[in-house]
């Protein structure tokens, strides 16, 4: 008799994805972030569901409903802070996952990579809308500033902004639709992530060497399930340390002031995980130019496979590309820092230089380094 896990229509899918899946024997801890992202998504959906039970999407009561969750609901404070800081953990894992893909050349699997970019855009949109829901000062002004960027689109811009707002300004209609979208999008992300996984399992995983591993595969369970559980424990430890000791570390104090359309905060800025893109947006004095640079800063990932010039897949044996990659990481950290600073000298010029550096490394220097390394192979 065939084992039920291999014959049952539903259990068979789980078996082929997480148990008997042939996996390269040499994948490192950098391959843990995919499973951690899945865990983060489930955690966000669960905590978000419980928050939605007590939240009201009305401009007059939204702020007080969040306060009510923290003060009066049983363990409401931990649910709220797990959700808020869970988003930060989500983006840490997301950026590590993308970084791993760029370093080891995982972008050579085009379907998986492009669906990943779609996922990134969707997660960013979801996180942005979630930040608006507590209806604090930074929620309101962040929503106003970011949605207003759509007005830079020629001809249809102004109409588009008013259509998104549901009126002439960010108000009740905006909050209600953002709540509705923020609730539905994680389920869409879950569906798209399943397709992401489906395409990955069509080709099989990449590995640190960048070479084919068909001759050296091991079952996913128990080897990588155990490895993933270790990653999960470390993730939960970090999240709980953040939630229980300094839950507001990554938040903005301005968001503890109820939204007031008549009073603009001195420094409007998004959550920390969007600061690098915000710095790129601000580094261009022209509105349309800034919006284009902001969009390109993420869309540039779709160009990475086209700009691959090296004969080798990953950067494991490519020292020049490695230096450029870590320079890119430092550049992104610099942009993140600049995004949180006021628009004044010397921050403006540092932001502009870091933005030029960001696009130069990906579009010019990395393809050149690939060509140089190809020639070095012939020495």
UniProtKB/Swiss-Prot annotation:
It comes from the Eukaryota. GO terms for cellular component: mitochondrial inner membrane; respiratory chain complex III. InterPro entries: Cyt_b/b6_C, Cyt_b/b6_C_sf, Cyt_b/b6_N, Cytb/b6-like_sf, Cytochrome_b, Cytochrome_b_C_euk/bac, Cytochrome_b_N_euk/bac, Di-haem_cyt_TM. It is a multi-pass membrane protein. PANTHER family: CYTOCHROME B (PTHR19271:SF16). The cytochrome bc1 complex contains 11 subunits: 3 respiratory subunits (MT-CYB, CYC1 and UQCRFS1), 2 core proteins (UQCRC1 and UQCRC2) and 6 low-molecular weight proteins (UQCRH/QCR6, UQCRB/QCR7, UQCRQ/QCR8, UQCR10/QCR9, UQCR11/QCR10 and a cleavage product of UQCRFS1). This cytochrome bc1 complex then forms a dimer. This is Cytochrome b.
């Amino acid at each position: 008799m065939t084992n039920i896990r291999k014959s049952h229509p539903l259990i068979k899918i789980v078996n082929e994805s997480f148990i008997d899946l042939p996996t390269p024997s040499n994948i490192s801890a950098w391959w843990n972030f995919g499973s951690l992202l899945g865990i983060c998504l489930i955690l966000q959906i669960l905590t978000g569901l419980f928050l939605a039970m007590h939240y009201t999407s009305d401009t007059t009561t939204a702020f007080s409903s969040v306060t009510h969750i923290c003060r009066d609901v049983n363990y409401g404070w931990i649910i709220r802070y797990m959700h808020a800081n869970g988003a930060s953990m989500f983006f840490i894992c997301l950026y590590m996952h993308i970084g791993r893909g760029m370093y080891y050349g995982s972008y050579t699997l085009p379907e998986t990579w492009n669906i990943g970019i779609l996922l990134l855009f969707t997660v960013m949109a979801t996180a942005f809308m979630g930040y608006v829901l507590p209806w604090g000062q930074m929620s309101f002004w962040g929503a106003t500033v970011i949605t207003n960027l759509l007005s830079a689109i020629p001809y249809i811009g102004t109409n588009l902004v008013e259509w998104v707002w549901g009126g002439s300004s960010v108000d009740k209609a905006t909050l209600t639709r953002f709540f509705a979208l923020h609730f539905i999008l994680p389920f869409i992300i879950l569906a798209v992530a399943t397709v992401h996984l489906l395409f990955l399992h069509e080709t099989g995983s990449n590995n640190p060497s960048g070479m084919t591993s068909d001759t050296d595969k091991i079952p996913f369970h128990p080897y990588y399930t155990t490895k993933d559980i270790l990653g999960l424990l470390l993730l939960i430890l970090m999240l709980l340390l953040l939630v229980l000791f300094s839950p507001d570390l990554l938040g903005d104090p301005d968001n503890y002031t109820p939204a007031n359309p008549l009073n603009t905060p001195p420094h409007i800025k998004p959550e920390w995980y969007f600061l690098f893109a915000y710095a790129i947006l601000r580094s261009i004095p022209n509105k349309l130019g800034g919006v284009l640079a902001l969009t390109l800063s993420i869309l540039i990932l779709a160009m990475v496979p086209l700009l691959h010039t090296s004969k080798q897949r990953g950067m494991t044996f490519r020292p020049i590309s490695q230096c450029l990659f870590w320079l890119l990481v430092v550049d992104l950290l610099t942009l993140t820092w600049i995004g949180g600073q006021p628009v004044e000298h010397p921050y403006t010029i540092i932001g502009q230089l870091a933005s030029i550096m960001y696009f130069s490394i990906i579009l010019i220097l990395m393809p050149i380094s690939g060509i140089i390394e190809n020639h070095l192979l012939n020495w």
